[in-house]
Structure formats: C-alpha cells, structure tokens
Amino acid sequence: MESGIPTYREKQTGFWACHNPERLETAKAFRENPSLVWGWYLWRRQQFSKAQPNAAHLALREMAGSMGTVSIITQNIDDLHERAGSVDVLHLHGSLSKPKCFACHRPGMVRNESAIMEEGALIEPPRCTRCNGKLRPGVVWYGEDLLPDVWKSALSLVKSCDVLISVGTSGIVTPAADLPNIALACGATVIHVNTVDVGMGAPNEIMLIGRATQILSHLSAFLSRELNSP
C-alpha cells in the first residue's frame, strides 16, 4: 500500500473493476480464458514496475546490514524487497517475475516489456520451451497449496529465530497467519507492526501500532544506535 500498490481487498478501477481478482487468480479461470488471466498479470506486473521500495523495505535492508542474519518471509508477489537491497527473501506466494508452465510446471522466462500495457488487454500466454504448454504466473492461486519446499523453509526460519517481526498481516490468510504463533511457541519474541492491535497477549509479544514505514524506520534507527553504542 505505502509503495502505491493496491491490495486485493481494495476496489479496483477501470476494466478490472468488473473482474474479481479472487476469480481471475485460479487454475479454472486460466483454463477457461488464459488470455484474460495473462493480460491481468502483465498489467499488474506493469503496475508493480512503477512502484518503488518504501521506507519499510529500506529499513529491513538496513537491519540486515547492522544485525547480521535477517531473513524476510513475504506474502507479496512483487520484487520490492529485492530492489531495496535485501538478499535473503522467501516468497511464500511465489513471484510475479517468475512464470512457470501450466502443464509441466517448468520455470519459464518472460521478457521485460517496455511498451505500455493497455488496461484490459487480452494477451495470449507464451509457450513452454519443453512441452509447448502455456506459461502461467509463478504465483500461488486461490485453491492451491504453498510449494512444500517453500513452506518447509519458512517453518525452519521461524522455529529457529530469536525475534520475529510480523508486519501488516491481517491474520486471515493461512498458513502464513500461523507463523507468529509458531515463533511464540518456540520461544521467540514476536513484534507485531500493524495499524490495529493484532496481538495475542503472550508475554514475549510486543505490539507496535502505526504505519510500517514509520515504525520500521524508527526501529532500525534504534537498533543501529544500540548496536553501535560503546
């Protein structure tokens, strides 16, 4: 949101106001109208490319620089963390920049388009170089499970961390919503950063209410001072 990317729960505008993202982002929708779904994702990819990392992304990168091991687990499918300079980023729901074959699931490649996408354009998906199947976005669609190796990596990181900072999550989308509870159960301190109180009342839990850009910037500056003080 603070980078200018609307959430799924925001009202879309223009052509896409007539299409529910939760219906477009399914395997069924892709089978029935691949050109519509592919056009939707290319349009979204174009919107993402216009966005810039915000102060929250930059603060997380700075924390990694001053604290050593900082891993980022994100539900976002954009590349703003990477463009901010973060290296250890795990995308639970996949990445918009990494398509794969709908038939054989082999990773594919899509060239970066410099032309401005027309909103609502119907675009035929490119083909897989191995089986000639249609390429689909490399993201987790509604009704699909997370990739097992990705979820396994996320669990390993959460179970072994000292501190988990949970930023902006609604607590609705599972299994990602379970990660703070898992960290608490393993003895980690959990810091919630949100505009509303989402804490669960655990003794090793901290609730920071406000915008992620402001709170993470202050937290990064505070940690830097503490770590660099004599």
Curated annotation (Swiss-Prot):
Any one GO molecular function term: protein-succinyllysine desuccinylase activity
Positions of NAD(+) binding: 75-78, 168-170, 194-196, 212
Database matches in PROSITE patterns: SIRTUIN
A Pfam family the protein falls into: SIR2
Binding site for substrate: 41, 44
EC number: 2.3.1.286
Compartment(s) where it occurs, according to its Swiss-Prot or TrEMBL record: Cytoplasm
UniProt binding sites for Zn(2+): 101, 104, 128, 131
Active site residues per record: 93
Family: Belongs to the sirtuin family. Class III subfamily.
Domain commentary: 2 residues (Tyr-41 and Arg-44) present in a large hydrophobic pocket are probably involved in substrate specificity. They are important for desuccinylation activity, but dispensable for deacetylation activity.
Protein name: NAD-dependent protein deacylase 1
Gene it is expressed from: cobB1
